[in-house]
UniProtKB/Swiss-Prot annotation:
PANTHER family: CELL WALL PROTEIN CWP1-RELATED, SERIPAUPERIN. It comes from Saccharomyces cerevisiae (strain ATCC 204508 / S288c). InterPro entries: SRP1_TIP1 (IPR000992), Yeast_SRP1/TIP1_CWP (IPR050788). This is Seripauperin-21. GO terms for cellular component: cytosol; fungal-type cell wall. One of its GO terms (biological process) is fungal-type cell wall organization. GO terms for molecular function: structural constituent of cell wall. It holds the Pfam family SRP1_TIP1. Disulfide bonds: none annotated. Belongs to the SRP1/TIP1 family. Seripauperin subfamily.
Length: 164
């Protein structure tokens, strides 16, 4: 889990898969196919299998997706960053809450902050406009949250307009 709270970093496992396929599978099959003089079909099949394995490794890389800012997947990434930021700067959030006592937050966010397990399911169903309101309502949104959200979305291969 990354410190932004967005989940598993798929980039690392993808690189390992590609390296494994390229280093272990492809050269052995290619050399075997090229040195086997008895069956031309084996040569073509083995080469095709090696190429398919490399293509599968490349296809396993995270695809990029353009989503609406109100898409629930975008909201979950934003809320994951927000929960992680609250955990990292709890005193600052307490001071902000004390200065703005009428500012309300969904109860699911408070539960996620203090539950250090998988909080993703707790945060589903919060309306997009409420997510935007609570995240952009803090003074450090543009300096701390927006860059972290942008980075987290990018790591997940998600591109969208982020509220300014």
């Amino acid at each position: 889990m990354t410190n932004e709270g967005i989940g598993i970093n798929r980039d690392t496992s993808t690189i390992c898969l590609r390296e494994y396929v390229f280093i272990h599978f492809f050269p052995v099959k290619l050399i075997s196919a090229l040195t086997n003089k008895t069956n031309t079909m084996v040569k073509l099949t083995s080469i095709a299998a090696g190429v398919a394995a490399i293509a599968a490794g490349v296809a396993a890389a995270p695809a990029t997706t353009t989503l609406s800012p109100s898409d629930e997947r975008v909201n979950l990434v934003e809320l994951g960053v927000y929960v992680s930021d609250i955990r990292a700067h709890l005193a600052q959030y307490y001071l902000f809450q004390a200065a703005h006592p009428t500012e309300t937050y969904p109860v699911e966010i408070a539960e996620a902050v203090f539950n250090y397990g998988d909080f993703t399911t707790m945060l589903t169903g919060i309306p997009a406009e409420q997510v935007t309101r609570v995240i952009t309502g803090v003074p450090w949104y543009s300096t701390r949250l927006r860059p972290a959200i942008s980075s987290a979305l990018s790591k997940d291969g998600i591109y969208t307009a982020i509220p300014k």
